[in-house]
Amino acid sequence: MMARRDPTSWAKRLVRAQTLQKQRRAPVGPRAPPPDEEDPRLKCKNCGAFGHTARSTRCPMKCWKAALVPATLGKKEGKENLKPWKPRVEANPGPLNKDKGEKEERPRQQDPQRKALLHMFSGKPPEKPLPNGKGSTEPSDYLRVASGPMPVHTTSKRPRVDPVLADGSATEMSDRGSVLASLSPLRKASLSSSSSLGPKERQTGAAADIPQPAVRHQGREPLLVVKPTHSSPEGGCREVPQAASKTHGLLQAARPQAQDKRPAVTSQPCPPAATHSLGLGSNLSFGPGAKRPAQAPIQACLNFPKKPRLGPFQIPESAIQGGELGAPENLQPPPAATELGPSTSPQMGRRTPAQVPSVERQPPHSRPCLPTAQACTMSHHSAASHDGAQPLRVLFRRLENGRWSSSLLAAPSFHSPEKPGAFLAQSPHVSEKSEAPCVRVPPSVLYEDLQVSSSSEDSDSDLE
């Protein structure tokens, strides 16, 4: 019977038994806790409690019978402040609080003793305390100390001004101080002498006491000479306005550059002042030199001439503004000169061709005129015959440096404008010296030369 048993079958049975035992065993990983135990790492999604999951039978959402009402815990009386806003009153203050109170009372008792000692040595009555309780330090307090150098006491408070004088005198003193700061020492002395007058006398006599400089400037637009008030005649008009006698006039006199851009205009009822103020170098009259109308300076200041139209052989406007040319050759005189007739003045009749005022608004020193330069006169009589008015003659002078200078020559009234010979014979202003070396230059060469000079000046002005 024993021989019939196969050892291989016995081995197979052992392997089967071992595999069945392995399958019955739990997995090798972490074991899950039994349902009765709680795991704080788990959280239920239904009730939000820790210790179980949503599938557990301990969840109160699934088993309502097992849900318990949370019981309130007992009160802890020692940690809660039932009356937080009630101040604590200490019936018996400690020894530390007593020491603090004594230290605060000691300086209060020493203050009246110090004031009494200071009153005895200085002899001054005791000071009354201010309503805000802050004491004020006076400069005399520093003088009471006998030893040591006297310190410098500076206060940042402004001096009080009397309310009666605060309205008028304070503003006048501030204005007077600002004016004195911008004037020279000589003007300060004259202004201090005029300040002793009354307010009304100061307004009328400021122009007479303070030496006002003449308003004759050497800028691009020379102004008429304005005389002080005391030099004008009694019957004539007053050229200086009333505002010039006040402090505003002094500030304008201190800034002469701001007045160059505003030409002064004389009124009509002042003919002697207007004739006296016009000098040889003025640029205000646009009419002929020997035939200046009576209202020429007023028209020159108020109504400036319009931009003339350019002909085929005339000078462009850019060359006129460059400073080397005078005016176009076909400029017509104002209509007042032809209608009112000639009115010759003694100063204007004595002028030479070099002194005749030009139309360009430039000072006379900016254009050098050499006596050795050759001169040439040109005029277009065809345009004058069509217009029916008197043309203006332009005298061109070629300088040594290759530039040109021009000046206006007034032509007298002639009956036959078609004849150029009669025009040259009747003009009294052309001197023999200028006609003798006269060389006729074609207009094209003259126009090209003027364009070159104007372009060179424009480039120089751009570089500056």
UniProtKB/Swiss-Prot annotation:
Q: Which segment of the chain is annotated as a signal peptide? A: none
- Which Pfam families would you find in this protein's record? zf-CCHC_6
**InterPro entries according to UniProt:** FAM90 (IPR039213), Znf-CCHC_6 (IPR041670)
Tell me the domain of life: Eukaryota
Q: Where is the composition biased (Basic and acidic residues)?
A: 74-89, 97-114
Stretches for region Disordered: 1-42, 70-389, 411-437
Q: Where is the sequence biased in composition, kind Low complexity?
A: 180-197
- Which family does the similarity line name? Belongs to the FAM90 family.
- Other remarks in the entry: Primate-specific FAM90A gene family, thought to have arisen during multiple duplication and rearrangement events.
Q: What is this protein called?
A: Protein FAM90A3
- Gene expressing this chain: FAM90A3
